Amino acid sequence: MYDTDPHRRGSRPGPYHGKERRRSRSSAAGGTLGVVRRASRKSLPPHARKQELCLHERQRYRGLFAALAQTPSEEIAIVRSLSVPLVKTTPVSLPFCLDQTVADNCLTLSGMGYYLGIGGCCPACNAGDGRFAATSREALILAFVQQINTIFEHRAFLASLVVLADRHNAPLQDLLAGILGQPELFFVHTILRGGGACDPRLLFYPDPTYGGHMLYVIFPGTSAHLHYRLIDRMLTACPGYRFVAHVWQSTFVLVVRRNAEKPTDAEIPTVSAADIYCKMRDISFDGGLMLEYQRLYATFDEFPPP
């Protein structure tokens, strides 16, 4: 008869029996823990999973960036080798002065936020690159002088003056002469027309600080995007003016006004307001456009200009 009781004295388990038992226990526990971890990770909401992944990536590269920070020369070499910017957008607050932008900056305004972008990495800027006309300062001056020959193209600009004259019972020709005395306002209108902008409306208000008139560029819809080339051309064409983006009653507006009491540049020829006024009488302004301007003026009468 053989003794089969393993607990009796003198009987010992094999040399690998305990190890196999411990291994089986640990594998079972590890397998269960892995399942629990995977299950708990899947049960997290999407934003929490994304945050967890970002934290993991940050921890992964923390040592690399800490080492680079100790050697500035290598840090600069790494940054110069990057072909894609590390930061593509920067949030801003309104009112925002476009003088704070740098070359290649675009501006996006929407209900989701306001931020500066990099034109080379902006899909909206890349999509609109082909729609820009030649709007150098020389070309703008030429368009200003020859506007009487293309007056119908500027009906949105002139219709606003007609509505403004009616609201204040002012002579239209005198108002037109005052606006033409600030060619930069016409430059902004021409740049917007040639820059693929989404047909903005133009309002004129007296400037209580520096005299003359301010221009409110009203963007339709619930969002606006200013192409980086458009920003650069406006700032270049109007060196004595300030451009401030703002919002009023859910409508985005770009305020254009003088920086100081500065006379008009002597290199810009004068344009006869009487000739433009006579030519305007041949234009039949759309009734819907005139009603829209009346509504916009009523909306922005209480707007405090920045």
Swiss-Prot record:
Chain segments carrying region Disordered: 1-49
TM spans (from-to): none
PTM section of the record: Phosphorylated at serine residues in the N-terminus. This phosphorylation regulates the localization within the inner nuclear membrane.
Pfam families listed in its UniProt record: Herpes_UL31
GO biological process, one term: exit of virus from host cell nucleus by nuclear egress
GO molecular function annotations of the record: zinc ion binding
Positions annotated as zinc finger (CCCH-type): 106-225
Cellular compartment(s): Host nucleus inner membrane
Key words of the record: Host membrane, Host nucleus, Membrane, Metal-binding, Phosphoprotein, Zinc, Zinc-finger
InterPro entries xref list: Herpes_UL31
GO cellular component, one term: membrane
Role noted for this protein: Plays an essential role in virion nuclear egress, the first step of virion release from infected cell. Within the host nucleus, NEC1 interacts with the newly formed capsid through the vertexes and directs it to the inner nuclear membrane by associating with NEC2. Induces the budding of the capsid at the inner nuclear membrane as well as its envelopment into the perinuclear space.
Quaternary structure and interacting proteins, as annotated: Forms a heterohexameric complex with NEC2. Interacts with capsid vertex specific component 2/CVC2; this interaction directs the capsid to the host inner nuclear membrane to initiate budding.
Protein family according to the UniProt entry: Belongs to the herpesviridae NEC1 protein family.
Protein name: Nuclear egress protein 1
Gene: NEC1
